Amino acid sequence: MPRLEDWEIKKYWEIFQGLDPVNKKLTGDKVAPVLKNSRLQDDQLAKIWELSDIDSDGKLDFEEFCITMRLIFDMVNGVSTAIPKELPSWLIPSSKAHLIQANNAVRSNSNQGFDYEDDEDGLSDDFDWYISPTDKATYETIYNSNSDSYGRVKFESLNSLYSSLSKVPKSDISSAWNLVNPKSFETIDKDQVLVFLHILNQRENGKRIPRGVPASLRATFSKEVPNYDLNSVQAKPQPSVGTGRKSFANDYLNKIGQANTITERGTDFSSTEGTDWEEVRLRRELTDLENLLHKIQNGNKNDNSNTNDDSALLKYEYEQLLKYKQNKLSSANLSTKSKDLTEVKGDLDLIQSQVSTLEDFLKSKSSELEKLNEEIRSLKA
C-alpha cells in the first residue's frame, strides 16, 4: 500500500479541524458521523478504532485520526478486503512507535522469564517511594548503560533487564512505564528512569504497582507545577529500613559487567540542579532553617545564663545561611520562568508553522477555485 501523501494528510487535517477537536483530540461521539458515513459494518469500525487509538485514551489525536481515515478509505475504495490485525509499519506514527512496541510486549507469548500470570493475592500495598542511596546507585548504573547520547532511554532498550526479573509480569512493566511517562513520549529522561526502575524493584520484592505517582513526581514527569506543600506526607521521604530483600537486578548487572560498581554512598542531589526538584529541596531547607532560627530566638528569651554572646553569634550565622538559601531559591525561580518562556516560544513556533501550512493549502485551493470559475465562464461564453 502507498504511504500517506502530503495532500492526503492536509485533507484529513481539514476534516479533523471541522469536527471541532478539544485539546487537540476528538471523542468517539464527534468521530461517529464520519465512521457511520463509511457504511462499514460496526465490528469493522470497532476494529479500526481499536487499531487507531494507540494510547487507549478513548480519543483520537490528529495522527490517530489519520490512521482511522486511511483504514476506512482503503476499505471503501477496495484497496483492502479486510481490516488488518495490526497496523502496518508505514502507518505507525514515529511518535507512537514505542507504544505499539510496549503493547505488543504485553500481548506476546514469548518464552521470556517474565511471562506468567500475575499473582495479585500475594502482593502487599505498602509501596515505598523512598529511594535509598544504594538503590539509587544501582539505578544510575543501569541508566548509564542504556541511555543514548541525549541522556534518554527507550522502553525496548531495557529488554534484557525485563527478562531478568522473575517476579514482574509484562503487564506490570508496561504499567510502570506508563506511570513515569504520562505524555507517552518515545523516550524518558534520567529522573523518570530512576523512578521506573524503583517501581520494578518494589514489584520484584512483592509490592503492588501503585495506580498513580505522588503529586511532586507527577508534576515533574508532566512538566507541570510541582507540589510545594512541605507538610505533605509525599514530600517527606521515609527512612531506609533493612528488610532483608534481595538486591535489585543482580543478574542483569553481572551480565553487563557492572555488578561491582555499586557502593553505599550518600544521596547525590547534583542531578536535580536546575529542575523542579531543586526548588522543592531548597524550600524544604528554608523551612528547616527558619524553624531552627525560631528555636534559637525562643531559647534566648528563656535563657538567663551568660551565653548571650554565643547565642547571638549562632543566630547571626544561621541568619546569613538563611539569606543565602533564599537567594538561591530566587535564582531557581528565575531559571524556571526562563524555561517556561522557552517552552512558550516553542509552542508559538509550532503554531506559526501550522498556520503557514494552512495558508499554503488555502492558496492552492483558492487557485483551483479560480481555475474552475474561469472554465465555467468560458463554457458560458
From Swiss-Prot:
PANTHER family per the UniProt record, alphabetical: EH DOMAIN
Gene Ontology cellular component terms for the protein in this record: actin cortical patch; actin cytoskeleton-regulatory complex; endosome membrane; plasma membrane
Chief place where the protein resides: membrane
Subcellular location: Cell membrane; Endosome membrane; Cytoplasm, Cytoskeleton, Actin patch
Topology class, membrane: Peripheral membrane protein
InterPro entries: EF-hand-dom_pair, EF_Hand_1_Ca_BS, EF_hand_dom, EH_dom, End3
Iron found in the keyword field: no
Domain spans labelled EF-hand: 40-75
Described purpose of this protein according to its UniProt entry: Component of the PAN1 actin cytoskeleton-regulatory complex required for the internalization of endosomes during actin-coupled endocytosis. The complex links the site of endocytosis to the cell membrane-associated actin cytoskeleton. Mediates uptake of external molecules and vacuolar degradation of plasma membrane proteins. Plays a role in the proper organization of the cell membrane-associated actin cytoskeleton and promotes its destabilization.
MF terms in GO: actin binding; calcium ion binding; protein-macromolecule adaptor activity
Binding locations of Ca(2+): D53, D55, D57, K59, E64
Domain EH: 8-98, 135-224
Originating organism: Scheffersomyces stipitis (strain ATCC 58785 / CBS 6054 / NBRC 10063 / NRRL Y-11545) (Yeast)
Ranges in a coiled coil: 278-381
UniProtKB keywords: Actin-binding, Calcium, Cell membrane, Coiled coil, Cytoplasm, Cytoskeleton, Endocytosis, Endosome, Membrane, Metal-binding, Repeat
GO biological process: actin filament organization; ascospore wall assembly; endocytosis; endosomal transport; reticulophagy
Subunit and partners: Component of the PAN1 actin cytoskeleton-regulatory complex.
Taxonomic superkingdom: Eukaryota
Name the UniProt record assigns to this protein: Actin cytoskeleton-regulatory complex protein END3
Family that this chain belongs to: Belongs to the END3 family.
